[in-house]
C-alpha cells in the first residue's frame, strides 16, 4: 500500500470517528488517537525513513496538511457539541415568563418612624434644623438648665432612671435645647427640633411606657411672640390631622416656659361633635408648649431683655395612636409582624 493511499484511508477514518463523537470526552479521545504523540498521524512520520531523500519534503508537507485538516474538523465538531449542549440545557430549563413570581415579604417603615418623619419634613420646610443629643444625660442639662431646681418633684428618684447622682437617662429631649442654646453663646436665632427616645419610671400599660419618643421644638430670637407659637402649632395640627382642624390653647404650667399652655386639636373623627376618641369633648390634647422662661434664657447665656422664644413638645407615640386608631402604646415596641403588616398596607395605599 502506498503512502498516499495510507494517508487517504487515515483521513477518512478520522472524519468518521470525529462525526461519531457524541460528547467532548469522546472527541478528546479521537484527538489523542490521531494527533497525540503516539497517534496515527505521528506514526506516518516513521515511513519517511524508507523514502528517497527527494520525496521526503513533499511527504512531510502532506502529513502536516493531514494534521491540520483533522484539527480543523475537531475544532468544528467541538463548537457543534458545545452548541448542542447549550440548546439542550435551554430546552430543559425553559422558563415560563407568564408564571407568577415567587412572593417575597417586604418590610415597611414603622408607624412611629413615619410619624416622626412627617413632623420633621414640616419643620425642615419652615427652616428648622434637626438636632440630636445624648440619651444618657447630665442632671445639669436635664433639669437645672431648664429651671428645675434640686427640690423639684420631677427630680424624684422614683420618676427618673438615675445612673449616678449626676447622670441619668434623659426624661425629655429638652437637654438638647439647653445644650444648643448654650453653644450659641447668647447669639440668635435658634430654630431647632429635637427628636429622640426618652425614659421615665412609668409602669407599662396601654397608654404609658418606660421608653417612648418625643419631639421638642425651640425658637429663640428677637421679638418672638405667643402669636408666632400659635401660628406654628396651627400649621402642625393641619399637617397631621387635616386641613380643617382647629386648635385650642389652655393655660397650664411647665417650669421651663411662662406662660405655658396645653394644646388641643378639634377631633378629626367626629368633627367636634363628641365621640369616644375625644371623650365626647370635641377636643383632643396633643402637646404642651409655651414661651421660654426668662430663667432658661439667662442660664443658657441669652439676654432675656433682648431675646424671647417659644418651645413645644409632643409625643409621636400619642400622635400615631390618634392618627391610626391604636389603643395600646405597647404595640409599637413588641415587633409583632401582624401589627406592623397593617401599616404596610396603609403605606401601599399612600395613606401614610
From Swiss-Prot:
Indicate the principal place this protein occupies in or around the cell.
cytoplasm
Cross-referenced CDD domains: PheRS_alpha_core (cd00496)
Q: What Gene Ontology cellular-component terms does the record carry? A: cytoplasm
Coiled-coil residue spans:
none
Going by the entry's taxonomy, the superkingdom of the source organism is recorded as Bacteria
Q: What's the record's note on cofactor binding?
A: Binds 2 magnesium ions per tetramer.
Looking up HAMAP family in the UniProt record yields:
Phe_tRNA_synth_alpha1
The annotated subunit structure for this chain is:
Tetramer of two alpha and two beta subunits.
What is the name attached to this protein's record? Phenylalanine--tRNA ligase alpha subunit
| Gene name of this polypeptide | pheS
Amino acid at each position: 500500500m502506498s503512502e498516499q493511499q495510507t494517508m487517504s484511508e487515515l483521513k477518512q477514518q478520522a472524519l468518521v470517528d470525529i462525526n461519531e463523537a457524541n460528547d467532548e470526552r469522546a472527541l478528546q479521545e479521537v484527538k489523542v488517537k490521531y494527533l497525540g504523540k503516539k497517534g496515527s498521524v505521528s506514526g506516518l512520520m516513521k515511513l519517511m525513513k524508507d523514502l528517497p531523500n527527494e520525496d521526503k519534503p513533499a511527504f512531510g508537507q502532506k502529513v502536516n496538511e493531514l494534521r491540520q485538516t483533522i484539527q480543523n474538523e475537531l475544532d468544528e465538531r467541538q463548537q457543534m457539541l458545545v452548541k448542542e449542549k447549550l440548546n439542550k440545557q435551554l430546552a430543559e430549563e425553559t422558563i415560563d415568563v407568564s408564571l407568577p413570581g415567587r412572593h417575597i415579604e417586604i418590610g415597611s417603615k414603622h408607624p412611629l418612624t413615619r410619624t416622626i418623619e412627617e413632623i420633621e419634613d414640616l419643620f425642615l420646610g419652615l427652616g428648622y434644623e434637626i438636632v440630636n443629643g445624648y440619651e444618657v444625660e447630665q442632671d445639669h442639662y436635664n433639669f437645672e438648665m431648664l429651671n428645675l431646681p434640686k427640690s423639684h418633684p420631677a427630680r424624684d428618684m422614683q420618676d427618673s432612671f438615675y445612673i449616678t447622682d449626676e447622670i441619668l437617662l434623659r426624661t425629655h429631649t429638652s437637654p438638647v435645647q439647653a445644650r444648643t442654646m448654650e453653644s450659641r453663646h447668647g447669639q440668635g436665632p435658634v430654630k431647632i427640633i429635637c427628636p429622640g427616645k426618652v425614659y421615665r419610671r412609668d409602669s407599662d400599660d396601654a397608654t404609658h411606657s418606660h421608653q417612648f419618643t418625643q419631639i421638642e421644638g425651640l425658637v429663640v430670637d428677637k421679638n418672638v411672640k405667643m402669636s408666632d407659637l400659635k401660628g406654628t402649632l396651627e400649621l402642625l395640627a393641619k399637617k397631621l390631622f387635616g386641613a380643617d382642624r382647629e386648635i385650642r390653647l389652655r393655660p397650664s404650667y411647665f417650669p421651663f416656659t411662662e406662660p405655658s399652655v396645653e394644646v388641643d386639636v378639634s377631633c378629626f373623627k367626629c368633627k367636634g361633635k363628641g365621640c369616644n376618641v375625644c371623650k365626647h369633648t370635641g377636643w383632643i390634647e396633643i402637646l404642651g408648649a409655651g414661651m421660654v422662661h426668662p430663667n432658661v434664657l439667662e442660664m443658657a447665656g441669652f439676654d432675656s431683655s433682648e431675646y424671647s422664644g417659644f418651645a413645644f413638645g409632643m409625643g409621636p407615640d400619642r400622635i400615631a395612636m390618634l392618627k391610626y386608631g391604636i389603643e395600646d402604646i405597647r404595640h409599637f415596641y413588641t415587633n409583632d409582624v401582624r401589627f406592623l403588616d397593617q401599616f404596610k398596607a396603609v403605606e401601599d395605599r399612600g395613606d401614610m
